[in-house]
UniProtKB/Swiss-Prot annotation:
This is HTH-type transcriptional regulator YidZ. GO terms for molecular function: DNA binding; DNA-binding transcription factor activity. Residues 25-44 bind DNA. Belongs to the LysR transcriptional regulatory family. InterPro entries: LysR-type_TF, LysR_subst-bd, Tscrpt_reg_HTH_LysR, Tscrpt_reg_YidZ, WH-like_DNA-bd_sf, WH_DNA-bd_sf, YidZ_PBP2. The keyword Transcription applies. Involved in anaerobic NO protection. It comes from the Bacteria. It comes from Salmonella heidelberg (strain SL476).
């Protein structure tokens, strides 16, 4: 008997499309920002609706049934038409449209020119406000003062900046992971020595004040080893620390994300990079997942969805 569309939750079709794309309940759940259990329940409802397994488990992931394969293109077309319909009022370049971003610098400086061009091309009358990521940026997202944040979090188990500790109201997407490097002036005396932990700790360090803290996971790892670095200078951000590390007349060294190589090239800073002198297990604790963050209420806001996609594409191209 033919079933009525009115009795089907249309969100199930989005779930079906993501399952077809990812061939994995876990990966589809991650893209939908729900639990794998929720996706499994949705799949059960879809199987009942279509009276077909739709997918079968294989060692390589979910394999679509013949019925699912036959529906793939129609489903994709239907979703595309739905997105175009929902985007229609936002594609009319409304007056007063405003983008509010909070981002880590120099990451935003690397990509902002390209991003702003894309925004103005799509929304010619839009205005853009960018603020530096700070200790209160998550609260600003929650209050609706910031549309989207773009910043690094931490991986050390004791860090207060783990992704798992984000407020429940915040959704996120990790765009890339970065292992920080040590940056030294190209004539720094450390470059004439064996590069090891003793050399790394022998010289004074530039640190940044990050969310009201002068220390980060690097200092936690050193503490676990019974060691400590001498922080001689604290600055507001990475661009200032890199600029100071490049200046003559001192032996200061800076630790900053690896992506900063693009910033250094852009500004022709005379810096040389060295890896952090730790073993693989210690480096794992120092990985920085660079992450887009937004409030759950904006998860399906066409403006925010488009902005996330634009930043994602730029990161893949530039970083």
């Amino acid at each position: 008997m033919k079933k009525s569309l009115t009795s089907l939750d249309l969100n199930l079709l989005l779930c079906l499309q993501l399952l077809m794309q990812e061939r994995s309940v876990t990966k589809a759940a991650k893209r939908m920002n729900v639990t794998p259990s929720a996706v499994s329940k949705s799949l059960a409802k879809l199987r009942a609706w279509f009276d077909d397994p739709l997918f079968v488990n294989t060692p390589l992931g979910l394999a679509p049934t013949p019925l699912m394969v036959s529906m793939e293109q129609s489903l994709a077309d239907w979703m595309q038409m739905g997105n175009q319909l929902l985007d229609k009022p936002h594609h009319q370049t409304p007056r007063g449209l405003k983008f509010e971003l909070a981002a880590e610098s120099p990451l935003m400086m690397i990509m902002f020119n390209s991003l702003s061009q894309q925004i103005y091309q799509r929304y010619p009358q839009a205005t853009i406000k960018v603020r530096n990521w700070d200790y209160d940026s998550l609260e600003a997202i929650t209050r609706g003062e910031v549309d989207i944040g773009f910043t690094g979090r931490e991986s050390h188990p004791r860090s207060r900046e783990l992704l798992s500790l984000l407020p429940l109201a915040i959704d996120f997407e990790v765009l890339f992971s970065d292992l920080p490097w040590v940056w030294l002036r190209e004539d720094h005396p450390a470059l004439r020595e064996a590069w090891d932990l003793d050399t790394f700790l022998r010289y004074p360090h530039i640190s940044i004040c990050w969310e009201q803290s002068d220390t980060w996971a690097l200092d936690d790892v050193l503490q676990e080893m019974g060691r400590k670095r001498h922080i001689a200078l604290s600055l507001p951000g990475f661009e200032q620390s890199l600029f100071m590390a490049a200046q003559p007349g001192h032996t200061l060294i800076a630790t900053a994300p690896r992506y900063c190589q693009h910033y250094n090239q852009l500004h022709q800073l005379p810096l040389v990079a060295r890896p952090l002198p730790f073993d693989a297990q210690q480096r794992e604790k120092l990985m920085v997942p660079f992450t887009l963050l937004w409030h759950k209420r904006n998860s399906h806001n066409p403006k925010i969805v488009w902005l996330r996609q634009a930043i994602n594409t730029l990161c893949r191209r530039l970083i």
